[in-house]
Amino acid sequence: FLLVSMMIIVSIATRSGMFNWIANELLRFTKGHPKLVLLTLGVFTAVTSAFLDNVTTVILIMPVTFFIAKQLDINPLPFLITEIFSSNIGGTATLIGDPPNIIIGSAAKLSFMDFLTELTGVVAVILVVIIALMLFIFRKSLKAAPEKMAAVANLDNSKTITDFPLMIRSGIVLMLVILGFILHDITHVETCVTAMLGASFLLLFEKPKDILCDVEWNTIFFFIGLFIIIGGLEATGGIALMAKWILAVTKGSQEATAMIILWASGFISGIIDNIPYTATMTPMLLEIQKTMGADYTLPLWWCLSLGACLGGNMTIIGAAANVIVSETSAHNGHPIPFMKFLKYGVLTMIISLVISSA
């Protein structure tokens, strides 16, 4: 319900042009300097991904990226690769930023503020380091003629907002929903209820049929089917056996167990989608929690979140946002070679996990 409600809120807010307007204003601020553009796109993508799903974020930012690259007459790949990394990094910071976190938060009863308190600091450090790394790696590509930069600096943003009342309405609802998430520990209102109230209010002013068509029902039913399969594994005792095996290998050491979960999650999530992986690991951690207690397991949840979300940066197929950017880029005449992305992705993931391990 949380995922469906947030998809509805984001779909309605997007129709107003709000996110494109924000992105364009930030880009005007850069005055067209390619390095500042990369920095701005990276930070904007990360912050937006903390509150919207990664796929929605990259879909919003890509048209702006291609427009800017065309105006500056430079290759858009440095921007696009940075946006992929930033979307996965930023999505790690909050409960609603990435589907694995929604799964973890629901299973472990972790609140929006729990994620914000525990993960935002390390995510911010990782983001700074990775954007600095991208600026260094692509330094030779990030050059543009002065007259090209002037075109971006004078970007007309006056017609980006297509529905001003809708922007105000959806913006207020989005802020109130996020505030509700933050105040969860005080109000004790479930995050899914808060999101559903916000989505229901916005639907009063829209045609529900049109909005519901924008919901990614394939993803929702994928989740439903996945949880049924995981429930079967749990009922047959398969999950309990996995939990006992991990504790036997680490001899019950919390630090060793945490490091195994962090690094294994990173590499596995780079090869397969992080959603089914997280859905499989979650009941296993709950089994460990039954044996070792909640205090022992709490750091393991954060390791699972960091590993699963950040591991998506390893390959071009590691996360749904990566695939969307890759396909769109190819359609626009700028394919992202698998091996080229892997070269940057492995480095990005290893640096991210090293920082997470510290």
Q: Could you tell me what each predicted segment is?
A:
Residues 23, 56-67, 80, 94-108, ...:
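Re-entrant/interfacial helical elements at transmembrane boundaries that shape
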Residues 21-22, 101-114, 183-189, 236-251:
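Membrane-interface helix termini and inter-helical loops of multi-pass transporters
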Residues 35-43, 57, 80-81, 116, ...:
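Hydrophobic alpha-helical transmembrane segments
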Residues 116-126, 256-358:
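C-terminal transmembrane helix pair
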Residues 1-74, 217-219, 224-292:
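Membrane-embedded alpha-helical segments and adjacent helix-loop junctions characteristic
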Residues 1-15, 120-244, 336, 343-358:
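Hydrophobic transmembrane alpha-helices of multi-pass small-molecule transporters
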Residues 44-53, 84-96, 180-186, 263-277, ...:
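Transmembrane alpha-helix interface/packing and boundary motifs in multi-pass membrane proteins
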Residues 68-147, 294-296, 324-355:
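Membrane-core helix-loop-helix motifs of multi-pass transport proteins
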